[in-house]
Amino acid sequence: HTMGPERAASRFKERNLRADGFIATLYGSLAKTGPGHLTDAILEKTFAPRPVEIRFDFSDRPLPHPNTMELTALQDGKTVDFERVISVGGGKIVVDGDTPDTPADVYPLSTFAEIKAYCAEHRMRLWQYVEQCEGDSIWLYLGEVWKCMKNAVARGLDTEGTLKGGLDVQRKAKMLYRQKHIDESAETRENRLVCAYAYAVSEENASGGVIVTAPTCGACGVLPSVLLYMQERRGFSDTEILRALAAGGVIGNLIKTNASISGAE
């Protein structure tokens, strides 16, 4: 609800450098949850310094996808360009009517059964399959991903106040992290800390902070919370964490390829 619209707006703005204004019409899920997801805020920021009128269309008109938006470029009050865009999740967009770009053939296998059989035949683990397909540079990338995840947890645990979005929801991560009870069981403590980490990242997302789409902004708190807890309390090394991220990426890629990572869809 933010990365996709931002990408679409930036692309459309670059294509219409002479336009003196824009209209962004949001439909479906984008319209109904736009302010809470800061969709309107990111569109205004992206189109700046030129003005943009944000329209929320709550009608039940047929749509090609629940996350549909229309962009109009104006010059002297007249329409000079128009585009309908679909935000399919994880920052990916599809322009209505265009043939989707064919992604690079990084992973030749598209089902887990195929990957499992391949790994068994070649006696490799999932992270080794990723390394084979992506190359050694994947570890530098995943290192940055892990650093960003930990930073998001740290910021979230150190911040109080009201979240953006207009619903006056208070941040809970810091309170939950410090709310230790004298008679707290080991299981309760574990649940409290994991939840606090997850809240911390999700609240950073709700405030427009820097997080990792895993695989989307809405799901951004789960992996950081579990992985950080396992590292801090169970002694998992950075290398093991990065390998876990690589394996998780395989699963996420299979879902994105064969189904959808869009909650609205």
PLM segments and residue spans:
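C-terminal regulatory domains involved in ligand/effector binding and gene-expression control
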Residues: 46-184, 192
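N-terminal phosphate-binding or glycine-rich loops at protein starts, especially the Walker A/P-loop
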Residues: 2-25
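Accessory "access/gating" subregions that flank catalytic or transport cores
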Residues: 140, 150-264
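A glycine- and small-aliphatic-rich helix-loop capping segment at beta-alpha/alpha-beta transitions
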Residues: 11-15, 39-46, 228-236
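Catalytic-loop motifs flanking and including active-site residues across diverse enzymes
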Residues: 4-8, 39, 219-223
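A structural-propensity feature for long, helix-poor, extended segments
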Residues: 21-56, 243-265
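Short coil/turn connectors at secondary-structure junctions
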Residues: 17-22, 48-52, 66-68, 79-81, ...
